Amino acid sequence: MSMASSSSSSLLAMAVLAALFAGAWCVPKVTFTVEKGSNEKHLAVLVKYEGDTMAEVELREHGSDEWVAMTKGEGGVWTFDSEEPLQGPFNFRFLTEKGMKNVFDDVVPEKYTIGATYAPEE
């Protein structure tokens, strides 16, 4: 193998690795802000996802296996009303307008603060 060929292979390998690392670090950020009016039976959350908007958002309470659809309101706020007190921490599953799907577990704690913004651990 010639020196030029070996050097080209090394450069190509480094370029591929750089692209892989860049892709891993460029995952869009998602945040969940608990909105005013949330209480033990009503949860209102503003979901922000960099570069995209939510098409569907589902909620799963702590200890439950059931995902329930949230209702989209004004300004990107998603709400859920329950007859029983809601049990956190809360898990979210969503589909964006661009087709990205994701699940985030235990994002909003049981004892959340109105106006606080929560982000999944990376």
From Swiss-Prot:
Pfam family, any one: Expansin_C
GO cellular component: extracellular region
Domain of life assignment: Eukaryota
Expansin-like CBD domain boundaries: 41-120
Tissue specificity annotation: Pollen specific.
Localization annotation: Secreted
Keyword NADP: no
Regions annotated as coiled coil: none
A single GO BP: plant-type cell wall loosening
UniProtKB keywords: Allergen, Secreted, Signal
Signal peptide coordinates: 1-26
Family under the similarity heading: Belongs to the expansin family. Expansin B subfamily.
Name of this chain's protein: Pollen allergen Phl p 2
Lineage, broadest ranks: Eukaryota, Viridiplantae, Streptophyta, Embryophyta, Tracheophyta
Annotated gene: PHLPII
